[in-house]
Amino acid sequence: MHRPAAFWIDVGVKTALIGLLAVGAFSGLHQFEGKAFGWRLVTYPLAAVVVPVAWYLAGRRPPFPYGADIFLTLPFLVDVAGNALDLYDSISWWDDANHFVNWALLCAGVGQLLLRTAVGPAVVFGLVTGFGAVTAILWELAEYFTFIRNSGELATAYTDTLGDLALGLTGSVVAALFTAAMAQRARAGPAPG
């Protein structure tokens, strides 16, 4: 059976995620200490199967949304790869870049799913932005409860959290703008030619 390239990219992203999670959870390397890898080991694989499970439960309407699945899994892979390479502790701007880029990727995935519906561009923009804002808040709450409240980072957590929320929201808005433009283009139909 011939599989599209997107299938193999999707499998590669998920395989890399699981492999790096195992390294983070079981290697004993210093860069994973205090980073809530037990929680990541449980929640990240669940996040990686949201699209396939939802697609299956929704009746498997073809084609499979590979783009959405890849976009929704990539932020988790980027996070774990950044920890594996010790980038959060060795590059001062890495965490900030991740909040922008990962929320752009996450929201692009949600946008790809919305493009499969009849929702108009303005609603797409609002839903993608809202999803990004809510998930950024939930992420920061999870960070606080899993490792910040009992760490040396607590003293600077408020300022860092505000910056992370702003960057996550900005990434969400960028993804929402692109997705709304794609929805508008799809509504307009093919260009005369």
Locate the predicted segments by residue.
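Membrane-interface helix-boundary motifs at transmembrane edges
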Residues: 3, 32-36, 54-67, 117-123
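Membrane-interface helix caps and helix-loop-helix hairpins in membrane proteins
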Residues: 29-37, 84-94
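Loop-to-helix transition at the N-terminal end of transmembrane alpha-helices
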Residues: 33-52
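Alpha-helical transmembrane segments of multi-pass membrane proteins
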Residues: 52-55, 75-82, 108, 131-143, ...
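Membrane-interfacial alpha-helical segments at the cytosolic side of multi-pass membrane proteins
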Residues: 101-118, 125, 148-152, 169-183
